[in-house]
């Protein structure tokens, strides 16, 4: 085997963010995050998907096709503790994504979704979808609120089906009691169930009808950024949420299965919805300029939301006061995003607009890392303060539909990866539970020369929130965030996940 470094094909955290699964051109590895260390690996060929089920010994594996046993159409479920294969399932086309919780296993192909009972690996249901080449879907880790969300393609919908409307009147064909034959190479899994879904095609397939036509007096509209919410227990779609104007780039479901976060392909606006009602309860603004969003992740307590993108900066948003007291009509959603994408106004959160009325907020300014002080950041920080005053003044003058443009909260904290190269680096992140940090162990971090920061960090032990980031160039970065002040996250350590 060559001594050259393997190519990374897949990286992900487990559902709790405590482990990392890595698939390379040479094999796969499983790492523990704290303390950091490798606890399982195999050098058996190239792997495209390596998914964990929490911290159990169960792994879902998909190869890259460099050898017959590792076909990209074959899903292999293994037990790492017993070094045994639990089952194998071969699908008609390449597998793009696999998600699991303790009740369900979901396999996404480009035009189909297969849902299995994870305890028996019995095929429960098959969904026909429009092409989903990015393999976008998100699944709730919770069994109590077990949901699957995936993007709905651009389609023509009669106006009687409004945004956030339930779709219980839409009939789904549910896979019967057909047992799936495992360890098979030629038979297509669930093939007999796919033909039964033609009646469902109007909901999941692109509608070729003329968008200007009408049906029974009902006007038609085109939706491009819709998300389908699917209940994995009842095996029924529950809702279509109009998340964005443009194409969906990333999505995530909170640990308890109650919230869904989405980002569009422009990457300027992040929205959070109540997955039960479809109400938009948070809207965050990542930045002014468009960027490619790679991942969205909730903290386990749903207090924070981390967003990674092509800018090599990770933004953390705080889920505090929702927008429920100032809800917007569904028509306002498009107006907000269009303005947010084109506007150069650097807005801030509603809570931050009342600095003068909240002296405790002024006393606890966001922490600023001295090593990241640049002229651009200083100008931006100054403009944010001016924007707060401007937004507060304008909010008293303009009606709700105009002031809604100012309501997108900006990030609570951020971190910049210490990557000097300009090469393309993809990242994913995970937010951990608060931990105690002994400041004496990191004197170079907590004695920055900033008088305000030094005064606040004189405490010997501080409560901090860990932020873990894994990059496609093979590094794990451990940061910590001040849960009270936010600002710049501090890097504690970094490890290579490619070196043995």
UniProtKB/Swiss-Prot annotation:
- The annotated regions of Acidic residues compositional bias extend over 331-344
Q: Where are the WD repeats?
A: 243-283, 288-327
One function term, GO molecular function aspect = ubiquitin binding
Subcellular localization is given as: Preautophagosomal structure membrane; Vacuole membrane; Endosome membrane
Which residues are recorded with the post-translational modification Phosphoserine?
Answer: 354
Q: In which broad location class does this protein mainly occur, judging by the first location in its UniProt entry?
A: membrane
**Where do we find the motif L/FRRG motif here?**
284-288
**UniProt keyword Membrane, yes or no:** yes
**Pfam families, A to Z:** PROPPIN
Please list the residue ranges that the record marks as compositionally biased, kind Basic and acidic residues: 181-194
Write out the entry's keywords from A to Z: Autophagy, Endosome, Membrane, Phosphoprotein, Protein transport, Repeat, Transport, Vacuole, WD repeat
Q: What is the effect of changing residue 268 to A?
A: Impairs membrane-association
Give me the ranges of the annotated region Disordered.
174-197, 328-358
Which positions make up the signal peptide? none
For this chain's UniProt record, which GO biological process terms are given? 1-phosphatidyl-1D-myo-inositol 3,5-bisphosphate metabolic process; autophagosome assembly; autophagy of mitochondrion; cytoplasm to vacuole targeting by the Cvt pathway; glycophagy; late endosome to vacuole transport; macroautophagy; nucleophagy
InterPro entries documented for this protein? PROPPIN, WD40/YVTN_repeat-like_dom_sf, WD40_repeat_dom_sf, WD40_rpt
Q: Which GO terms describe its cellular component?
A: cell periphery; cytosol; endosome; endosome membrane; fungal-type vacuole membrane; PAS complex; phagophore; phagophore assembly site
Keyword Transmembrane helix assigned: no
Membrane-protein topology: Peripheral membrane protein
Further information in the entry reads: Present with 1560 molecules/cell in log phase SD medium.
Q: Which family does it belong to?
A: Belongs to the WD repeat PROPPIN family.
Subunit structure, interactors included: Component of the PI(3,5)P2 regulatory complex, composed of ATG18, FIG4, FAB1, VAC14 and VAC7. VAC14 nucleates the assembly of the complex and serves as a scaffold. Interacts with ATG2, the ATG2-ATG18 complex being essential for autophagosome formation. Interacts with ATG9. Also interacts with VAC17.
Function per UniProt = Phosphoinositide binding protein that plays a key role in cytoplasm to vacuole transport (Cvt) vesicle formation, pexophagy and starvation-induced autophagy. Component of the PI(3,5)P2 regulatory complex that regulates both the synthesis and turnover of phosphatidylinositol 3,5-bisphosphate (PtdIns(3,5)P2). Involved in correct ATG9 trafficking to the pre-autophagosomal structure. With ATG2, protects ATG8 from ATG4-mediated cleavage. May negatively regulate FAB1 activity by sequestering or masking VAC7 from FAB1. Plays an important role in osmotically-induced vacuole fragmentation.
Protein name, per record? Autophagy-related protein 18
Which species does this protein come from? Saccharomyces cerevisiae (strain ATCC 204508 / S288c) (Baker's yeast)
Q: What is the lineage of its organism?
A: Eukaryota, Fungi, Dikarya, Ascomycota, Saccharomycotina
User: Gene encoding this polypeptide?
Assistant: ATG18
């Amino acid at each position: 085997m060559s001594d050259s470094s393997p190519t990374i094909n897949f990286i992900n955290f487990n559902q709790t963010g405590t482990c990392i699964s890595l698939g390379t051109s040479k094999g796969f590895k499983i790492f523990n995050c704290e303390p950091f260390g490798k606890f399982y690996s195999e050098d058996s060929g190239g792997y495209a998907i390596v998914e964990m089920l929490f911290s159990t010994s169960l792994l879902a594996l998909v190869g890259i096709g460099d050898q017959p046993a590792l076909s990209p159409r074959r899903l292999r479920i293994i037990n790492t503790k017993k070094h045994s294969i639990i089952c194998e399932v071969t699908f008609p086309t390449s597998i793009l994504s696999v998600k699991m919780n303790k009740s369900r296993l979901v396999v996404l192909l480009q035009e189909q979704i297969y849902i299995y009972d994870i305890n028996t690996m019995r095929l429960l249901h098959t969904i026909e979808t429009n092409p989903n080449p990015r393999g976008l879907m998100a699944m709730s880790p919770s069994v109590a609120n077990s949901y699957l969300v995936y993007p709905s393609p651009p389609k023509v919908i009669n106006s009687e089906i409004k945004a956030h409307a339930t779709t219980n009147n839409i009939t789904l064909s549910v896979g019967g009691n057909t047992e799936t034959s495992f360890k098979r190479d030629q038979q297509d899994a669930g093939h007999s169930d796919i033909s039964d879904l033609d009646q469902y095609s109007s909901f999941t397939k692109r509608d070729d009808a003329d968008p200007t036509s009408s049906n029974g007096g009902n006007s038609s509209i085109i939706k491009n950024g819709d998300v389908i919410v699917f209940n994995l227990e009842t095996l029924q779609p529950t809702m279509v949420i109009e998340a964005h104007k443009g194409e969906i780039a990333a999505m995530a479901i909170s640990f308890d299965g109650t919230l869904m976060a989405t980002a569009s392909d422009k990457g300027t606006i992040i929205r959070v919805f109540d997955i039960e009602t479809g109400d938009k309860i948070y809207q965050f603004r990542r930045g002014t300029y468009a960027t490619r969003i790679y991942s969205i992740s909730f903290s386990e307590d749903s207090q924070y939301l981390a967003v990674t993108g092509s800018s090599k900066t990770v933004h953390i948003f705080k889920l505090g006061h929702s927008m429920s007291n100032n809800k917007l009509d569904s028509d306002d959603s498009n107006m907000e995003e269009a303005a947010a994408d084109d506007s150069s106004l650097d807005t801030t959160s509603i809570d931050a607009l009342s600095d003068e009325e909240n002296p405790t907020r002024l006393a606890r300014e966001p922490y600023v890392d001295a090593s990241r002080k640049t002229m651009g950041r200083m100008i931006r920080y100054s403009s944010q303060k001016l924007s707060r005053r401007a937004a507060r003044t304008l909010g008293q003058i303009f009606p709700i539909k105009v002031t809604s443009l100012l309501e997108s909260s900006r990030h609570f904290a951020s971190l910049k990866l210490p990557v000097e190269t300009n090469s393309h680096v993809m990242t994913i992140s995970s937010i951990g539970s608060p931990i105690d940090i002994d400041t004496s162990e990191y004197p170079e971090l907590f004695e920055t020369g900033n008088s305000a920061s030094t005064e606040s960090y004189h405490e010997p032990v501080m409560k901090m929130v860990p932020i873990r980031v894994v990059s496609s160039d093979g590094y794990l970065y451990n940061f910590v965030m001040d849960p009270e002040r936010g600002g710049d996250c501090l890097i504690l350590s970094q490890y290579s996940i490619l070196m043995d």
